[in-house]
Regions:
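Tryptophan-centered motif/residue detector
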Residues: 1, 29-32, 61, 187
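Conserved N-terminal glycine-rich FAD pyrophosphate-binding loop of Rossmann-like flavoproteins
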Residues: 1-22, 177-196
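Conserved N-terminal glycine/acidic-rich loop preference
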Residues: 1-2, 19-24, 127-131, 139
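Short, solvent-exposed coil/turn linker segments
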Residues: 5-19, 28-31, 124-126, 164, ...
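A conserved beta-strand/loop capping segment in the N-terminal third of enzymes
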Residues: 19-53, 224
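Flavin (primarily FAD) cofactor-binding/catalytic cores of flavoenzymes
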Residues: 42-148, 152-383
Length: 383
């Protein structure tokens, strides 16, 4: 999803940074609401989902309370050092950091179609940069993708009453926009500690198949966003109030070629039906790639010595233990987060199990840390 004023995260606000493992913590989302003087207003507002901008404020609030967090630093290189690691920062003025263990959680990279990787500019860009690009003067917008981010962009464009937009076109490979599989039964089987533990124990080839099967438990669009977009399009077509924007959807299609021309800043886009192979050329002033993200291992920040001691599987993916530590032959431990769909499943990048991940790491380092209270799930068992 996008960080827009109306955008929400598809998680309960009880699944914050800490509440699932310590509900009485001062760092809970509810304590954030209380300490920022908005708890009563938040309850009265009766939000069905957590607003994305408010969750970001919550994260920043937690960071402000932690003296050990150093923002504005960039890691240049991680090397072996005695019993652990030496972390060299890009700002050479700052002293290196020495530590016994490290946790790496650099997130994901935008997934860009290969033929466009070297052609990104002010008019062709990934949706992660959406808010940094002006739409002023743009008349015809093409959105590639049909997931949550793509739909949120549609809502945002229609809400901009001062825009010059005349047409919006969506192109995506699916037959229709799939909604997120977030039923109670799906949550019970996938987004719980028991569900995660059951998945981790499965053989690799089965995990790969299940990740495809469970895809829309992670990557689908929220039902209320799908409904909102459809209602906006309905009003746009039939209300006869205000400016009408031409809207087209080309489903089961992909973009196969993009040619920029100097004439009127026009972009010629060739789209192709993935089954019939029929092609059509359309024009756009701007292309927004809502094409998702990909996990990657940040090998560029590790020394060759460290990389040579990290075990990989037959598909050259790093081997990750259930407690998120890499299978590493050196001294110290390397914990790796948001890079383990191949080991931990579609739940791996999701915010909902942040607290559980953190607890697993702490328990692996500190055997005196209080053991968790076992939580029951209604249908989480297996044989």
């Amino acid at each position: 999803g996008m960080k827009l004023k109306f955008a929400t995260i598809q998680n309960s606000n009880l699944k914050d940074l800490i509440s699932l493992v310590k509900p009485t913590s001062e760092y809970s989302f509810f304590n954030f609401l209380y300490e920022t003087g908005r708890l009563e207003s938040h309850i009265i507002a009766n939000f069905s989902f957590t607003l994305r901008w408010e969750y970001e404020q919550y994260i920043q609030w937690v960071i402000s309370k932690l003296d050990t967090v150093r923002m504005g630093n960039e890691v240049k290189l991680i090397k072996e050092y005695e019993e652990g690691f030496e972390i060299i920062l890009k700002n050479d003025i700052q002293k290196p950091i020495f530590t016994k263990n490290i946790s790496v959680a650099l997130g994901v990279k935008p997934l860009i179609p290969e033929f466009l990787e070297n052609n990104l500019n002010e008019r062709i860009f990934h949706n992660s940069e959406y808010q940094f690009h002006s739409k002023k003067g743009t008349k015809n917008i093409l959105i590639v993708g049909g997931g949550q981010s793509a739909l949120e962009i549609v809502v945002d464009l229609f809400n901009d009453k001062n825009s010059d937009i005349e047409s919006i076109t969506m192109v995506y490979r699916e037959l229709f926009t799939h909604q997120m599989e977030d039923s109670q039964f799906a949550e019970d089987k996938i987004y719980t500690e028991m569900g995660l533990s059951n998945f981790y124990k499965l053989p690799s080839e089965l995990k790969e198949n299940l990740n495809k099967q469970y895809r829309f438990a992670s990557d689908g669009a929220s039902p209320h966003t799908i409904e909102e977009v459809y209602q906006i399009l309905y009003a746009n077509r039939y209300s006869k109030i205000g400016k009408q924007i031409k809207f087209n959807i080309y489903s089961e299609c992909s973009v196969c070629d993009v040619t920029e021309t100097d004439k009127d800043l026009d972009i010629k886009v060739t789209i192709e039906n993935i089954y019939s192979k029929n092609q059509k050329i359309i024009s756009a002033d701007m292309i927004i790639l809502a094409t998702g993200y990909k996990q990657y291992f940040p090998k560029e920040i590790f020394s060759d010595e460290i990389l040579s001691k990290i075990k990989k599987d037959d598909n050259y993916n790093v081997c990750i233990s259930e407690n998120y530590s890499l299978e590493y032959e050196g001294k110290g431990k390397i914990f790796y987060l948001n890079g383990g769909k191949h080991t931990h499943g579609v739940v791996d990048p999701n915010l909902s199990l942040n607290a559980s991940r953190a607890r697993k790491i702490v328990l692996s380092l500190d055997k005196t840390f209080p053991k968790p209270v076992k939580q029951d799930t209604i249908f989480g068992g297996t044989i």
